[in-house]
Amino acid sequence: MRRSILWLVVCLMLGSCALAAQSSSPTSPVPEQQSAATQRTPPAPQTPPPAPASSPPQLQTIPGTQAPAQLPTTGTLQRLTVQDAEALALKNNPQISVYRLLALASQQVTRQQKAAYYPDLYGSLTAVKPEEGSRIAAGNLNNPIVYERAAGGLALSQLITDFGRTNNLVATAALHAKAANMNSVATADQIKLAVDQAFYNALQTVALLKVAEQTVSARQLVSDQITTLFQNKLRSQLDVSFANANLAQARLLLLDAQSNQQAALSLLSEILGYASQQPFDLVESAEELKPPPDSVSRLVDEALSNRPEIAAQTYEYQAAQRFQKAERDLLFPSVEALGVVGRTPYSNTVAGVTPFTSWYGAVGANVNIPIFNGFLYPARSREAALRAQADEEQLRDLKDRIANDVRASWLNAITAFNRIGVTQQFVDQTNLAVDLSQTRYSLGLSSIVELSQAQLQQTEAAIQFAAAKYQYQIAESVLRFQIASSSPSGP
């Protein structure tokens, strides 16, 4: 009897060892004759053991994958705050130079119009050898006789008055120059806004990259644990498939995050005026985020007073008014003084008489009175008046659009600020849901589907929370731009 019992114990021990050796092999297939209840129903609740050191993680390498995309960079790593980025862009961005040069060019137009205030002095050298008896028979009404001569002299003309036309043309050019200068200021504000958006987008991609890396790490751990449980016949192939699918999804998220970070840094480098991507160490501001103002009406009034686009369009409207007056003044006479002086060192005699003296000079005045030119001047004046009215309507439309943009930006800023707190609650609740789902799954009270759903929500919450802070800073920058505020800490 004792011998039979001892033999039975030895057989059981040998069978257990063989079964354990077979189950420890990572390539051992699932027995096909295993019942469905055994495959779907987990055994008694127990704590999942850690993955053995000898067991390689599942999906550690995926065939056909490559290293993350990395754009080539030039230069050394430099720390960069948003204020430093704005200063670099204002210094290096070619759009700043373009509008600054256009403003300088507009100032030269003013000098061109002012030239009418000054005398027009020019010199002439003339030498004539006509055919004998030649007369100018065709062309203008002038003296047809052509004398043989060689002479040189100076001619001077000076505008006395054109009854305001020149003054209005000079004022028109000066107002255009002021409008060009305001356009240069508006361009600088737009570049600063683009810098802020690119800077905070780059910071957001860095935060999302960290979220993606943490997600991959967490799901890798879950995949390893479930794979180990499956190898020990404690979980089914379905559990392993769900875990590995979640891991692959996290890796896709990581690839997108890596690509987006490189693209964001490339865009930031381009806005800062670099031809190639630069390596930046972006530094966040330590200032606490402040909520937007409570009243939007004050912001609208501030925008209508400060926006350089409104100032530029106002100058354009005023310039159109002055130009209309200048076109109207074409109907008035113009008075100018004339003077000539010169010397004739050589001239031929005609019938024994010298037709020229050795020196000559004269002064006089000329009055030009427009009488009729086919209604050209009235049409030009009417055209200028209509264009001035169009500029006035454009100014009114611009003010309406800016007021609407301020209201929309204010609403976006409030929404973005409120999203920070809501996404924090979202993160807290999803973290709790993942902990509870993990516990229920470990105890065998739920399926892998519940745990996978909780992990997906946790990842979504982490992404939303990482983006909420930077999206508010972008919305804050847009609001500052809309009201033309130079405060870096908020409106």
Where are these regions (language model features)?
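Bacterial Sec-pathway N-terminal export signals of envelope proteins
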Residues: 21-126, 132, 159, 276, ...
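Small/polar, glycine/serine/threonine/aspartate-rich low-complexity segments that form flexible
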Residues: 68-78, 111, 124-158, 282-293, ...
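Sec/SRP-type N-terminal targeting helices
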Residues: 97-101, 114-115, 146, 160-188, ...
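Short segments within alpha-helical structural elements
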Residues: 115, 249-274, 416, 425-485
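Periplasmic alpha-helical coiled-coil/stalk elements that build and connect Gram-negative outer-membrane
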Residues: 186-302, 412, 416, 457-459, ...
